[in-house]
Regions:
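A polyampholytic, Gly/Pro-enriched intrinsically disordered region
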Residues: 162-172, 217-221, 242-251, 402-413
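Structured loop/turn residues at beta-strand edges in well-structured enzyme cores
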Residues: 16, 164, 194, 220, ...
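Nucleotide 5′-phosphate-binding alpha/beta core
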Residues: 1-78, 84-105, 163, 356-358, ...
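Core-facing hydrophobic residues within beta-strands of well-ordered domains
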Residues: 22, 196, 341-343
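Conserved AMP-binding/adenylate-forming
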Residues: 197, 206, 210-298, 316
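Active-site phosphate/ATP/adenylate-binding loop shared across adenylate-forming ligases
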Residues: 54-198, 205-209, 213, 217
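AMP-binding/adenylate-forming catalytic core of the ANL superfamily
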Residues: 169, 272, 277-379, 404
Length: 466
């Protein structure tokens, strides 16, 4: 993906940067043989290089991508494993500093001296460390409060935001949903009672409808952060809501899923990344596994760098009613349906014959089923209103010190856990009192009954729909 007028898009400069990456990568076990003798005389030479897959990374082993001596490496990280096997990356201090500097340069109003950043990114993930580094470089005051942290459960995080007057909440997309529900339970309006003016969110799909809902609930600007464990930072969104790629850090190609050819403006395809600024674990033509859509034209914000919309992982695409749906499309439609009844708490279950969207209702007068149908025309769907606390038990969540990376969609047609609520995938259950046990048991019984009814429907469905 290149854009006229952007320095890194100059063919000569880009070719030199790609050649430098190939030279660095050759020092790793992963690329030692496959890049032997490779010389790039043109961009066409580069585009003929084979793709690197996640399977290649896994077969290379934890140390396989490391191209720098251990003496120069300061940071090791692993992917969460939500997409399969774990991948690793080794980073130098310069690798971290370049990503941090790019974020601060792209978002100067968000990260500035004196601004307080409540850093809720899990500390096994790179964004948490980038937030700390941005603060150390003069971009604010960071509060290290990772959400997978026994010391800072959700209630304490909310209290920290109140006490410190935090202006930036940085974390996974569900973080402001959970904190907003806890604030609501305590009679606190996040818009009026907190100083947060920016939600800096990444690590999971952040569809437009959810961005709108969160922005309205918090009275804050929503910024999307995009990257991966393997590639580090790939981009952040502008004020026009477009996700701009960091062309100084990575060269990105968008290739047609069927033909492998580059797609034009407005086209969809798999994202292939070559890192330009990583010394520790450089990567050449990595298929990151995501499907993106290129912007159809120049962005209204004036930024000439290419912009994309992340549609979801290619392997997570769902075939239903003759249509191929990306996870982001489904989650976006579900978020809009929930917003129609003044809620941000929802969970999607993919069944053989339909989508089931479960929504904690808040008394809004909209028609969530109509909204869902308008967003996903022709897709069989059902909206199930449930009582507050059925999908996200705020009280129980407040007592649980251990919270996992959340999911809002579960495909019951595939092997694995059949999740029905947000809480099932997030919480390590604490010891219950008698009152807690009675309340939890009643909720669990209702959920179990619903699960059995849905499972019975799976058994009765025609074989061809499974």
């Amino acid at each position: 993906v290149t854009t006229p007028g952007v320095p890194t898009a100059s063919p000569d400069a880009l070719l030199a940067a790609l050649e430098a990456t190939v030279a660095r990568a050759r020092a790793s076990r992963l690329y030692a043989e496959r890049l032997t003798g490779v010389r790039l005389r043109s961009l066409a030479d580069f585009e003929r290089l084979p793709l690197t897959t996640r399977r290649d990374l896994q077969e290379a082993g934890p140390d396989g991508t490391r191209a720098a001596p251990r003496e120069r490496v300061c940071h090791y990280q692993e992917s969460s494993g939500t997409s399969g096997a774990v991948n690793s990356a080794w980073l130098t201090a310069g690798d971290l500093e370049r990503s941090a500097a790019a974020i601060r340069a792209a978002q100067p109003e968000t990260f500035a001296p004196g601004r307080v950043i409540l850093n809720r990114f899990p500390f096994m993930a790179a964004p948490a460390h980038l937030m700390q580094l941005i603060a150390q470089q003069g971009g604010g005051i960071a509060i290290p409060a990772g959400n997978i942290n026994w010391d800072v459960p959700f209630p304490r995080a909310l209290e920290l935001a109140e006490r410190t007057g935090a202006q930036v909440l940085a974390g996974l997309p569900l973080e402001p949903v959970v904190l907003g529900e806890i604030a609501r339970a305590r009679g606190l309006d996040p818009r009026a009672g907190l100083a947060v003016d920016t939600l800096f969110l990444g690590g999971a799909p952040l569809p437009p409808a959810l961005q709108v809902r969160l922005g309205r609930t918090w009275g804050a600007r929503v910024i999307e952060l995009y990257g991966s464990t393997e590639t580090m930072l790939l981009g952040t969104s502008c004020r026009a809501g477009m996700l701009h790629l960091e062309t100084g850090l990575a060269h990105c190609e968008v290739l047609d899923l069927a033909t492998g050819a580059a797609v034009g403006p407005g086209g969809e395809g798999r994202l292939v990344v070559t890192t330009l600024a990583l010394e520790g674990s450089p990567l050449v033509r990595l298929d990151v596994g995501d499907v993106v859509r290129r912007a159809a034209g120049p962005c209204a914000c004036g930024d000439l760098r290419p912009a994309v919309t992340v549609l979801g992982r290619a392997e997570d695409a769902i075939e239903l009613a003759g249509r191929r749906l990306h996870a982001s499309e489904i989650v976006d439609a579900a978020a809009a349906a929930a917003d129609a009844v003044d809620s941000a708490v929802f969970f999607v279950v993919v069944l053989p014959d339909r989508l089931l969207v479960r929504i904690e209702t808040r008394g809004g007068r909209g028609d969530p089923a109509a909204v869902l149908a308008s967003r996903l025309p022709g897709v069989p769907s059902e909206v199930e209103p449930v009582a507050a606390g059925m999908l996200l038990d705020v009280e129980m969540l407040c007592r649980s010190p251990h919270v996992y990376k959340p999911v809002v969609l579960s495909d019951w047609r595939r092997p694995g856990r059949r999740i029905l609520t947000l809480g099932e995938g997030m919480i390590e259950w604490p010891r219950l009192t008698w009152q807690d046990g009675r309340r939890w048991l009643g909720r669990a019984v209702r959920t179990a009954r619903r699960r059995r009814r849905l499972a019975r429907g799976l058994r009765l469905a025609p074989v061809g729909t499974r």
